[in-house]
Amino acid sequence: HYKLAFLVPENEVHCGEVHLLNIGLSWEFESSESAVYAWMDPAIPRALYKPRPIFAHKGNFGHAQLIAGSYGMMGAAVLSARACLRSGVGKLTCLVPECGYTVLQSAVPEAMCTVNGERFIADATEVEKYDALGIGPGIGIHASHRLWLEKVLQQVSTPLVIDADALNILARHPELFSLLPPLTILTPHPKEFERLFGPVSNDFDRIGLAMESSRKYNILIVVKGHYSFIACPDGKGYFNSTGNPGMATAGSGDVLTGILTGLLAQGYPPKQAALLGVYLHGLAGDIAAAKSSPEALIAGDISNSLGEAFM
């Protein structure tokens, strides 16, 4: 296993290029060792992946809803919707403001679309009828958002993914934490993480606080970055092995939200969805970067490469 010190950004200058070598320990010995942290190599997502049955129809793969978009930020909704569909979900409905209706219907014809509000989403209703819910990409921050987010959290019993501006609303109103359904998936980048859970002085403290907060609120926390870290309320933490610097680009997180929401809607338990989704997101990014270079990679390339990642 990698040592924790090799996996945090602040130590990169001291580590150089790190390779994990086989020193001959038996698989039985390694599997018997209980460790808090795990390195997510390909064996974990392969074990989690569920092939599609031959005699299947779209109803077998769930109905997801994405609450996303606002005036000037409909691209986030489009990116998230495309990724959700590429993840294998059976049906997708997007809730967007009226200004985004034509944009979404034109850019993602495979998705259904409902509207509320004109330039931003003013309310969210009937959320309980979906198999999974993703909230946040491009919604902006407006006074009404806190009210409908609270209502959604009170009504929903289906798995949730919370990202982007929905995380910032949650950070401004920490009383909403008590309403989060068990095993909700939060996907903050490091700055969003500190707004949610408090300042940290180094990467080791961030990992520790993520583990503590995951147990405290019974949620899954995906701290995005190189070697994205998934903190689980069962006391385990996972470092992702896929991804590259080219994925540090606008919209990459919206793609991840779509993937996670789609996997949840298909019936993957939240922990499995988080691990598989983060791994696939990074692998699709690696495939895209190999084609276009990390510098030229854009978020849409990630969702377009999901097919190869599944293969």
Regions found by a protein language model. Give the residues of each.
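Small-residue (G/A/S/T)-rich helix-start motifs and N-terminal tracts that mark the onset
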Residues: 3-160, 168-185, 190-311
